């Protein structure tokens, strides 16, 4: 399927896309890599992106896949937190002329967290400040992607209630964020401020941005999504505690 999408796009005249469970990018990887190498702007819609819909068990739950796809040069892995960010990701994908895009989507329902004109949404820059500290300068920055942005927002509320100003950054795309100016990147991830990442996947590459990482460094488990996430530590309370442990 992914190879066919690449062939249709390379032929010209049609913008093709294909979709499957995100876990099955294991079978798609060679064709995704060839699309990236050939600067072919294919679009892939990959769903069931975490243990958040957990009844199928670990065979169908991606954990290493976000890192594996981000590791391929010239691939835009875009994992939105809500419908507004998804629309922004589609816009970026359709405007791309030399880069394949993976839209990595949840299957479970998510709240709408972001605001902004879809014609110019800050998610198009790869990462942006979704929630600023309530008062004063942030002492900690919580970086979330996809369905875990809501976890970061809830953890922020816990920290603020404890007197710790916290910022939430939504980072749907490392690829797009790295293309921004140094000034913009520093305005989002302020130097000197402790950072915690939260993503329902392996934490291997997150030290690039974060001082501490909340993730899943093991295979998943078969359980309702909410229970699976709790068992694996993807909870607001755990994220807030990890942030507190970073601070003097």
Identify the residue ranges that each predicted region occupies:
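Thiamine diphosphate
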Residues: 1-67, 85-88, 95-248
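Solvent-exposed alpha-helices and their adjacent loops that cap or buttress functional pockets
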Residues: 9-10, 35-38, 44, 68-71, ...
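Short, surface-exposed connector motifs at secondary-structure boundaries
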Residues: 11-17, 72-75, 135-140, 165
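General beta-strand structural signal in soluble alpha/beta enzymes
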Residues: 17-18, 44-46, 77-81, 103-105, ...
């Amino acid at each position: 399927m992914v190879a066919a999408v690449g062939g249709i796009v390379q032929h010209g005249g049609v913008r093709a896309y294909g979709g499957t469970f995100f876990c099955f990018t294991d079978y798609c990887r060679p064709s995704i890599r060839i699309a990236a190498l050939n600067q072919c702007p294919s679009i892939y819609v990959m769903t069931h992106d975490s243990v958040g819909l957990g009844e199928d068990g670990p065979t169908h739950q991606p954990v290493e896949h976000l890192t594996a796809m981000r590791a391929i040069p010239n691939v835009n892995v875009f994992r939105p937190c809500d419908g507004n960010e998804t629309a922004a990701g589609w816009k970026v994908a359709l405007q791309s002329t030399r880069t394949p895009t993976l839209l990595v989507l949840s299957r479970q329902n998510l709240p709408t967290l972001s605001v902004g004109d879809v014609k110019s949404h800050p998610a198009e820059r790869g990462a942006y400040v979704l929630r600023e500290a309530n008062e004063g300068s942030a002492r900690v920055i919580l970086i979330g992607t996809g369905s875990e942005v809501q976890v970061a927002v809830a953890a922020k509320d816990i920290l603020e209630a404890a007197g710790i100003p916290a910022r939430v950054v939504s980072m749907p795309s490392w690829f797009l964020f790295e293309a921004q100016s140094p000034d913009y990147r520093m305005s989002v991830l302020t130097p000197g401020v402790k950072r915690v990442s939260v993503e329902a996947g392996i934490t291997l590459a997150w030290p690039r941005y974060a001082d501490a990482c909340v993730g899943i460094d093991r295979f998943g488990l078969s359980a309702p999504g909410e229970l699976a996430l709790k068992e694996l530590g993807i909870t607001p309370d755990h994220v807030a505690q990890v942030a507190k442990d970073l601070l003097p």
